């Protein structure tokens, strides 16, 4: 195959590029002979016409051009080195490389500027390989120069090799470095909107990994998880990626007016600015509200935000916020949250006390809590102001403490109730109620055609537990107010309710052991038959034995018992043995209501309190008091402090 024109003897003498330039300079109409002696042309020196620049340049101008070129090359080299070494800390939006690239690319050489290597493609791979080697610690002390084989197509050269000089090779490498560094700066630009985040399958894991890389601690080590976006909280921790620096400067000032405490930290990475903040809002907000507010203020999409409430019981998390708030990289405003202060400041550490069950029992007794759920919930609510409650929350035996506290409160309440007489108990219950009006109760009895004198006489014997008068039954048609009357009285006296539905169990009467008064509502024929067979002695008000679950039999005197029924045993002779043991009052009239559906006669605790106070002398409920008045103190179940005198 014949060689292409102008490609012989490549590497010796003039290169192929200069031969092509000589052919182009010929006139269009000139004809080149095939048997032209190429050696003669080389000897004549016509191919070297444009090789030497005969332009007269003054010494001062030549020196100025050299200095300008040297300055441009040094600026380029310094910028590239600075970008490689400190690319993590340099703002990706303003770089000296971007300012110097257009001028340097043209000032290196006018002839070199006309050359396009590889059809205008930029060599990116060499720079990335060099950066990877330097990041890994290898190849940092040597500069690898790899010559690229340039292919020729149709006699048109695409590159320069070998013999055309080392200066062109060095200048070409400088252009490559400039183009590569420009690509790196372009990748660091925030205008890409962190495209890499959208390419990964697990976005949350990618963000958490980048967060730990930047701040040295995992995001989930600082927060607790809220599964629902509707859960409200005053304290929130959020991390935001890809924030514009111009917006980041005024973020703290914008949000400070809405928060009681605000802690912000900013750092940079190849994704842009990254924000970590702890904020205590003036009002509780849910996650949807916080995310919507941050996305609007910082101009970022929702998937670039991680928002969770902070860990309040983690000493490590509290120490992180405390230590980072003392550094120059954080901006803090407002009062430090108490959960940080308690876990980091010495005075709070010294003030921590061990949990005391007696203090918890005293609190439950003073506030009238005997149910386990109420004790656990309300005692946890005062952990901010009570040191013992805070120690209770830190304990791993909270359930055990709650059970023990409820059991002790019930024991104290039961002993207190048994110690009191019926008059003292009614007075004790009346102290917990307001003062009402006794007349609605009397009017209701008159409305039901009950003689007040007879009712008060029976009520006095019933309250004092006189044998054969220890049970009162209210009978009548439905909707006459029998159950309403009895339930209101039981609520005021804090009595217990028993039900015949549990009669199949041997323990259905067990609650009578710990009761001051009791009530059995809606006694049917089966219940009357059961009472006539098994409960005659109980209705008498005499001592009887009650079976208790997991305990031995208890011998008790039946408390005053109130019954309601639609069956009047006075009219049935088969209950003749119960007629002498049960005092019967009949409610014949329907219970009255006004036009709004409210009861005409209000049966409240306040009205019952006024009723017993008004008729205390008739019911013989006077309590014995000293001449100076009552001097008893509230029960105290915590150990006192012994004062030692010198």
UniProtKB/Swiss-Prot annotation:
The gene is E1. ATP binds at residues 476-483. This is Replication protein E1. GO terms for cellular component: host cell nucleus. Can form hexamers. Interacts with E2 protein; this interaction increases E1 DNA binding specificity. Interacts with host DNA polymerase subunit POLA2. Interacts with host single stranded DNA-binding protein RPA1. Interacts with host TOP1; this interaction stimulates the enzymatic activity of TOP1. The lineage of its organism: Viruses, Monodnaviria, Shotokuvirae, Cossaviricota, Papovaviricetes. Residues 149-159 have a biased composition (Acidic residues). Residues 186-352 are annotated as: DNA-binding region. Its main location: host cell. There is a cross-link at residue 557 (Glycyl lysine isopeptide (Lys-Gly) (interchain with G-Cter in SUMO)). Disulfide bonds: none annotated. Its EC number is 5.6.2.4. InterPro entries: Helicase_SF3_DNA-vir, P-loop_NTPase, PPV_DNA_helicase_E1_C, PPV_DNA_helicase_E1_N, PPV_E1_DBD, PPV_E1_DBD_sf, Rep_E1_papillomaV, Znf_lg_T-Ag_D1_dom_sf. ATP-dependent DNA 3'-5' helicase required for initiation of viral DNA replication. It forms a complex with the viral E2 protein. The E1-E2 complex binds to the replication origin which contains binding sites for both proteins. During the initial step, a dimer of E1 interacts with a dimer of protein E2 leading to a complex that binds the viral origin of replication with high specificity. Then, a second dimer of E1 displaces the E2 dimer in an ATP-dependent manner to form the E1 tetramer. It is found in: Host nucleus. The keyword Ubl conjugation applies. Belongs to the papillomaviridae E1 protein family. The keyword Phosphoprotein applies. It comes from Human papillomavirus 7. The modification Phosphoserine is found at residues 91, 95, 109. A motif (Nuclear export signal) lies at residues 108-117. It catalyses: Couples ATP hydrolysis with the unwinding of duplex DNA by translocating in the 3'-5' direction; ATP + H2O = ADP + phosphate + H(+). Keywords: ATP-binding, DNA replication, DNA-binding, Early protein, Helicase, Host nucleus, Hydrolase, Isomerase, Isopeptide bond, Nucleotide-binding, Phosphoprotein, Ubl conjugation. It comes from the Viruses. Pfam families: PPV_E1_C, PPV_E1_DBD, PPV_E1_N. PROSITE patterns: SF3_HELICASE_1.
């Amino acid at each position: 195959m014949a060689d292409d024109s102008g490609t012989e003897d490549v590497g010796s003498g003039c290169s192929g590029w200069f031969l092509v330039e000589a052919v182009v300079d010929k006139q269009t109409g000139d004809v080149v002979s095939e048997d032209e002696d190429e050696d003669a042309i080389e000897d004549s020196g016509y191919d070297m016409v444009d090789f030497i620049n005969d332009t007269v340049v003054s010494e001062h101008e030549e020196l100025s051009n050299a200095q300008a070129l040297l300055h441009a090359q040094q600026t380029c080299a310094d910028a590239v080195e600075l970008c490689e070494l400190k690319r993590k800390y340099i703002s990706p939006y303003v770089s000296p490389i971007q300012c110097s690239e257009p001028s340097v690319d043209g000032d290196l050489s006018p002839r070199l500027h006309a050359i396009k290597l590889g059809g205008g493609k930029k060599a990116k791979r060499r720079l990335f390989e060099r950066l990877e080697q330097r990041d890994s610690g290898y190849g940092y002390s040597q500069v690898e120069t790899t010559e690229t084989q340039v292919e020729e197509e149709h006699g048109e050269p695409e590159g320069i090799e070998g013999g055309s000089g080392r200066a062109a090779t060095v200048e070409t490498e400088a252009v490559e470095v400039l183009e590569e560094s420009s690509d790196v700066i372009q990748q660091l630009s925030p205008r890409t909107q962190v495209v890499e985040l959208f390419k990964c399958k697990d976005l949350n894991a990618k963000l958490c990994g980048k967060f730990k890389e930047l701040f040295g601690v995992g995001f989930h080590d600082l927060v607790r998880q809220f599964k629902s976006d509707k859960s409200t909280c005053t304290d929130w921790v959020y991390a935001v990626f890809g924030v514009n620096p111009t917006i980041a400067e005024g973020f703290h000032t914008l949000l400070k007016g809405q928060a009681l405490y605000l802690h912000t930290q900013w750092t940079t990475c190849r994704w842009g600015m990254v924000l970590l903040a702890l904020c205590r809002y003036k009002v509780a907000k849910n996650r949807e509200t916080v995310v919507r507010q941050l996305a609007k203020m910082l101009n970022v999409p929702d998937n670039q935000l991680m928002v969770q409430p902070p860990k309040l019981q983690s000493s490590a998390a509290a120490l992180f916020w405390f230590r980072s708030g003392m550094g120059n990289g954080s901006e803090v405003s407002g009062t430090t949250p108490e959960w940080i202060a308690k876990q980091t400041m010495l005075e709070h550490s010294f003030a921590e006390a061990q949990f005391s069950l007696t203090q918890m029992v005293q609190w439950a007794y003073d506030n009238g809590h005997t149910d386990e759920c109420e004790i656990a919930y309300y005692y946890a609510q005062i952990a901010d102001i009570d040191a013992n409650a805070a120690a209770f929350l830190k304990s791993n035996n909270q359930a055990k403490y709650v059970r023990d506290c409820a059991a002790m409160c019930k024991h104290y309440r039961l002993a207190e109730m048994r110690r009191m007489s019926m008059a003292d108990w009614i007075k004790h219950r009346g102290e917990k109620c307001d003062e009402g009006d006794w007349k609605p109760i009397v009017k209701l009895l008159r409305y039901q055609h009950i003689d007040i004198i007879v009712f008060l006489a029976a009520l006095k014997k019933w309250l004092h537990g006189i044998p054969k008068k220890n049970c009162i039954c209210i009978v009548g048609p439905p909707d006459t107010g029998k159950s309403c009357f009895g339930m209101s009285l039981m609520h005021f006296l804090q009595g217990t309710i028993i039900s015949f539905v549990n009669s199949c169990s041997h323990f259905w009467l067990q609650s009578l052991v710990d009761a001051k008064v009791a009530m059995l509502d809606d006694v049917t024929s089966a219940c009357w038959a059961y009472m006539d067979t098994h409960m005659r002695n109980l209705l008498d008000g005499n001592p009887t034995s009650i079976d208790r679950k997991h305990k031995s039999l208890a011998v008790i005197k039946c408390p005053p018992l109130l019954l309601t029924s639609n069956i009047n045993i006075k009219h049935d002779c088969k209950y003749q043995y119960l007629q002498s043991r049960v005092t019967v009052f009949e409610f014949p009239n329907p219970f009255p209501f006004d036009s709004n559906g409210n009861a005409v006669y209000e049966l409240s605790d306040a009205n019952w309190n006024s009723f017993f106070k008004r008729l205390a002398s008739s019911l013989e409920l006077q309590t014995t008091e000293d001449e100076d008045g009552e001097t008893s103190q509230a029960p105290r179940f915590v150990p006192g402090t012994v004062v030692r005198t010198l």
